[in-house]
From Swiss-Prot:
Function, as annotated: Converts chlorophylls (Chl) into bacteriochlorophylls (BChl) by reducing ring B of the tetrapyrrole.
Main location: membrane
Compartments it resides in: Cell membrane
Protein's recorded name: Chlorophyllide reductase 52.5 kDa chain
Membership in a protein family: Belongs to the BchN/ChlN family.
Membrane topology: Multi-pass membrane protein
GO BP term (any one): photosynthesis
Parts of the chain that traverse the membrane: 70-87, 131-147, 221-238
Reaction equation(s) it catalyzes: 3-deacetyl-3-vinylbacteriochlorophyllide a + 2 oxidized [2Fe-2S]-[ferredoxin] + ADP + phosphate = chlorophyllide a + 2 reduced [2Fe-2S]-[ferredoxin] + ATP + H2O + H(+); bacteriochlorophyllide a + 2 oxidized [2Fe-2S]-[ferredoxin] + ADP + phosphate = 3-acetyl-3-devinylchlorophyllide a + 2 reduced [2Fe-2S]-[ferredoxin] + ATP + H2O + H(+); 3-deacetyl-3-(1-hydroxyethyl)bacteriochlorophyllide a + 2 oxidized [2Fe-2S]-[ferredoxin] + ADP + phosphate = 3-devinyl-3-(1-hydroxyethyl)chlorophyllide a + 2 reduced [2Fe-2S]-[ferredoxin] + ATP + H2O + H(+)
Length: 502
């Protein structure tokens, strides 16, 4: 643990968000070594040891707040909790978030854990909640606050404790897996202990395929239609919206890793003896391969699989042909669906030389990676912002699809751009419905090249270099000061050069 100038240990809350290595070491020293090793195995880091996007805990917090009859408690620094609460409600949360404050004394003495336990007991009302999720942020995790010692159940309310530190979970997308995996593990233990309640929607009369990864609401419906000719049905989407959906998900014979980074969730499905199928029914080739993989996993006859393919592939081919995309596109994001979106763009006619995803590489993304690389696309897992910007500037695309800073940089260069999360991933992607869904927004954006050029010319020099920042009046450039300083630099350089000769 870091020390103060006097030699005393530095409290973890004094380290801040950028003391990643120190906090990780502190967490291991405080008894969370096994947790940190699990994070390293599940979510290997890339070139950066800290997230370059939103705080990871936002992902688990958001999915927890979407669940019915599930309460939320956060243990973390006040500034972090405020920010997470604000952004969660900004994105539509309609539920209060419980918060357990702390200080250096309560961290050191263990009083924080007692406060958390007291808060959980106070909140555990079976009339209101099926479960309560308690989340440790960076400082409590680094201090070793042991959520695993909380009761697993209070008054019939399940207690799920998770650690989501920024120094262990690289992206907020993967934090969704941390919570989903913990809930699946709890639900699996309930199933092993005896009968459980059926989902509110009831049990399917056909074998089901659980779907891993948040997706556009129409996509599970489309996947269900694709599975129907095989005698199958779409199961729950994980992360779930109701606790009892977890039982139905684990009851599925196959789990489809639509988003391939759900490592902890996959581990729970495998522990339950379920087969895992990667990729997604996206585009012509993706749908054909995915249906074949599902058929193989369920042991369905080849002729039945072929019939299902023949029922949908012509429609997908027609939709792709009817909504062509022409242009070069670089693609990057942190949602985990970047590779399947790139496949859809390429089958629509676009050239995609680069795909960067902040998610890590897993076996469940192998089919998509191989398909893309066979078509000349550079696929970068754990891509950094620097990777994405270099690709955009190097490939000079007609359109850059990416995260906010990528879009910002593209606009400054006069390159049309789209924000991946709001404008691309929030659209249907699966089957015939997804085949033509991107053309309108993509082609409209590519058509803005001339407008972007005019805007760049009009604002040339504004807010750049010496004029950057906020000025109440005209920027005070003082070229005379610049010239005088340049002369000093040149004189110093000449003096250094003459000393080298001596």
């Amino acid at each position: 643990m870091s020390q103060t100038p006097g030699g005393a240990p530095m409290a973890p809350e004094a380290m801040g968000c950028h003391s990643t290595a120190d906090m990780a070491a502190a967490a291991s020293a405080a008894g969370n070594g096994e947790l940190m090793e699990r994070f390293k195995a599940d979510y290997p880091v890339g070139p950066h040891d800290k997230p370059q996007s939103m705080c990871p805990a936002f992902g688990s917090l958001r999915t927890g707040l979407r669940m019915r009859r599930v309460g939320t408690i956060i243990s973390g620094s006040a500034c972090c909790t405020y920010g997470l609460s604000f952004v969660s409600h900004f994105y539509g949360a309609r539920r209060s978030i419980g918060y357990v404050p702390f200080n250096s004394e309560s961290l050191v003495t263990g009083k924080l854990f007692e406060d958390i336990r007291e808060a959980v007991h106070e909140m555990a009302d079976p009339q209101r909640y099926d479960a309560i999720v308690v989340t440790n942020l960076c400082v409590p995790t680094a201090s070793g606050v042991p959520l695993r010692l909380l009761p697993s159940e209070i008054n019939g309310v399940r207690i799920v404790g998770i650690d989501v530190p920024g120094f262990g979970v690289p992206t907020h997308a993967e934090a969704k897996d941390v919570l989903a995996g913990a809930m699946l593990k709890y639900a699996r233990s309930e199933i092993e202990a005896g009968p459980v309640q059926a989902p509110v929607s009831g049990r399917s009369d056909r074998p089901t395929v659980a779907l891993l990864g948040e997706m556009f609401p129409a996509d599970p419906v489309m996947i269900g239609a694709l599975l129907a000719p095989l005698g199958l049905a779409a199961g729950p989407v994980v992360p779930c919206r109701d606790w009892r959906e977890l039982y139905a998900a684990l009851d599925s014979g196959v789990a489809a890793a639509i988003h391939p980074f759900y490592t902890a969730s996959v581990r729970e499905f495998q522990a339950a003896g379920r087969a895992i199928v990667g990729s997604a029914p996206v585009g012509h080739d993706g749908t054909a391969a995915w249906l074949a993989a599902i058929g193989e996993a369920y042991g369905i006859a080849a002729d039945k699989v072929a019939a299902a393919q023949n029922a949908f592939l012509p429609a997908i081919r027609g939709a792709l042909a009817g909504a062509p995309i022409k242009g070069r596109i670089t693609l990057s994001g942190y949602e985990g669906s970047e590779l399947i979106v790139a496949r859809l763009l390429i089958e629509s006619g676009a050239e995609v030389p680069y795909v960067g995803t902040a998610a890590g590489r897993t076996p469940w993304s192998a089919a998509d990676r191989e398909w893309l690389e066979a078509r000349g696309t550079v696929v970068k897992f754990r891509a950094s912002l620097e990777d994405d910007l270099a690709a955009m500037q190097g490939f000079e695309p007609d359109l850059a699809v990416g995260t906010t800073p990528v879009v910002q940089k593209a606009k400054s260069l006069g390159i049309p751009s789209l924000y991946f999360t709001n404008l691309i991933s929030a659209r249907p992607l699966m089957g015939p419905a997804g085949a033509g869904s991107l053309a309108q927004v993509i082609n409209a954006a590519i058509g803005n090249r001339e407008r972007m050029s005019k805007m760049k010319a009009f604002f040339a020099g504004v807010g750049e270099g010496d004029t950057a920042g906020i000025w109440e009046g005209a920027p005070n450039l003082r070229p005379d000061f610049r010239a005088a300083h340049q002369k000093k630099l040149e004189k110093a350089a000449r003096a250094a050069k003459s000393e080298e000769m001596i």
